[in-house]
Curated annotation (Swiss-Prot):
Annotated source species: Rattus norvegicus (Rat)
Residue spans crossing the bilayer: 26-46
Protein name in UniProt: Uncharacterized protein SPEM2
InterPro entries: SPEM1_N
Pfam families (UniProt xref): Spem1
Keywords: Membrane, Transmembrane, Transmembrane helix
Membrane-topology descriptor: Single-pass membrane protein
Record flagged with keyword Transmembrane helix: yes
Gene Ontology CC: membrane
Lineage, broadest ranks: Eukaryota, Metazoa, Chordata, Craniata, Vertebrata
Composition bias type Polar residues, residue spans: 103-112, 135-147, 349-377
Compositional bias per record (Basic and acidic residues), positions renumbered to this chain: 313-324, 378-389, 467-478
Stretch list, region Disordered: 103-180, 313-402, 431-504
Length: 504
């Protein structure tokens, strides 16, 4: 029994001794597991960073390869760099063309040779022209002997208008020999290229107005190989121009020369009339009196004064001239809204007067220009005396493009009662014809003379200030007091004088 008890006690002690060893082993196992987990985490992080770097390197290499492939594939598809390089070469060669094509002065050898050659050809063909054009050309040759200062002064007067009839050759020479700015040189060369591509015939072509000779520019004489010049081995300078340079605006002189070459009786009536009036203004001495401008004849785009020397016309003369087969240039459209509204207000009162004239009906609004032009019966007779000249200058009829509002405006101003400020008594249109026939058969010619002042600095139009208008009104009043008063006439004021009478 004792042995059994001893063995049992020994077995219990051995059990108590084995239990702490198991606890220590468990702790060691836990520590090992923790260490292993930490090591594995560190290893995984290192591996992940390595994979990330490798992936980034792969993507960067792939992008570089794709970029290289795109760069290698693009050059055969687009040949644009070569064209851009050509345009750049053209732009570099432009200043060479500009420097070589410009004549230094109007007295250069090439210009002198060109003018002498044209004068010789004109003298050889003088017998081919009619008698009227022969006299005109003889007067042209006499006028070409004036000094260069006189030509420059005439060019300043007609720089923005149409050149006159008899000074056609002179204006050609002045526009050819006038030194041009830098941006106009390429236009000269483009015109030269067009001249060589489409050469003019040897004999002068016959237009509707007679014979004329095509005019060439002076830059092609002795420079680009016509006479074996310094640039005979080079092509035309316009070949070096880029499309951007060809789109530059043309110069005004070239357009005016083209207008002169298109001269004929069927070409624009207003242009011919402007040439006639400019010729009368330039050739005749300054007249002793002036005409007041009428704001109902204002050019479109500018108000309220006329832009140049336009001769005013009477409505009766206009109707008679239309029946005879010749008409003055068409009336300019008025943009004076206040006078137009006044014309519409007085339109109802003008119906009774319209019945006195069989030609001014509602079916013919295009043949009645504004009738209030502001001049006396003597001046209307002077305009009437120019009818044969008008019939020679205008063989074909062109209907006037006057609106109905302008017709109503002219008739309303025709019926308007005189104001206190208007001192000039104007007779009725039906009685003016008889008085004009009884009056002096040779009155002095009245020519419209614009002011020499130009306040705006732009030479496209002449501006009338208040002082000049006041002075002209006073002069017209003095002339009206000196003229014999009409016997029985319905007085009517001028539209312009009734408006500007407040200046007195």
């Amino acid at each position: 029994m004792e042995n059994q008890l001893w063995q049992s006690t020994l077995g219990c002690c051995s059990q108590y001794q084995e239990s702490p060893q198991d606890a220590e082993n468990i702790l060691f196992l836990l520590l090992g597991l923790i260490i292993l987990v930490n090591i594995s985490i560190n290893v995984t992080t290192v591996i992940w960073h390595g994979l990330q770097n490798a992936i980034d390197k792969m993507f960067s290499r792939m992008h570089q390869k794709t970029a290289e492939v795109q760069v290698t594939e693009c050059p055969p598809k687009e040949p644009q760099p070569a064209n851009v390089q050509d345009v750049h070469i053209h732009c570099v060669l432009d200043p060479v063309q500009v420097k070589m094509a410009q004549p230094t002065q109007c007295s250069s050898s090439s210009t002198h040779y060109f003018r002498k050659h044209s004068n010789d050809r004109r003298s050889r063909r003088r017998y081919c022209y009619p008698r009227g054009s022969l006299q005109i050309r003889q007067s042209n040759q006499q006028q070409s002997c004036h000094s260069r200062q006189q030509r420059l002064r005439n060019n300043r007067q007609f720089s923005h208008g149409y050149p006159p009839f008899r000074k056609q050759r002179q204006s050609h020479k002045a526009s050819q020999t006038r030194p041009m700015p830098f941006f106009d040189l390429e236009d000269r060369d483009s015109l030269l290229e067009d001249d060589q591509s489409c050469p003019h015939p040897k004999q002068p072509r016959r237009s509707r107005g007679g014979l004329y000779k095509p005019v060439r520019l002076a830059s092609n004489a002795g420079l680009w190989g016509r006479q074996g010049g310094i640039l005979a081995s080079l092509p035309l300078p316009s070949l070096y121009l880029s499309p951007e340079m060809r789109r530059l605006p043309k110069r005004v002189e070239a357009k005016s020369e083209l207008r002169l070459q298109g001269f004929g009786p069927h070409y624009s009536q207003s242009r011919i009339c402007g040439n006639v009036e400019a010729e009368q203004w330039a050739s005749s001495p300054p007249p002793p009196r002036r005409l007041l401008p009428n704001p109902s004849w204002v050019t479109v785009g500018y108000s309220p004064f006329p832009s140049g020397g336009h001769i005013p016309y009477d409505a009766r003369d206009q109707w008679r001239r239309g029946t005879e087969g010749c008409e003055p240039p068409p009336a300019f459209v008025s943009r004076n809204l206040r006078s137009d509204a006044q014309g519409y207000r007085d339109h109802s009162s003008s119906q009774a007067h319209r019945q006195n004239f069989p030609s001014y009906t509602h079916s013919q609004p295009n043949h009645s220009p504004p009738q209030s032009v502001g001049y006396s019966s003597r001046e209307s007779h002077e305009v009437r005396r120019r009818a044969p000249d008008w019939s020679e200058a205008f063989p074909s009829r062109h209907p006037l493009t006057t609106s109905t509002s302008l017709t109503a405006l002219g008739e309303a101003s025709y019926q308007r009662a005189p104001t206190a400020s208007s001192g000039l008594v104007i007779p009725h249109s039906s009685q003016r014809l008889a008085e004009g026939q009884i009056s002096d058969p040779t009155p002095p010619a009245t020519t419209f003379v614009p002011l020499s002042r130009n306040p705006g600095g732009n030479a496209n139009y002449q501006v009338y200030d208040s002082l000049e208008l006041k002075r002209q009104v006073q002069e017209n009043r003095g002339r009206a007091s000196s003229l014999p008063p009409p016997s029985t006439s319905a007085s009517r004021p001028s539209l312009h004088r009734s408006r500007t009478g407040k200046l007195n």
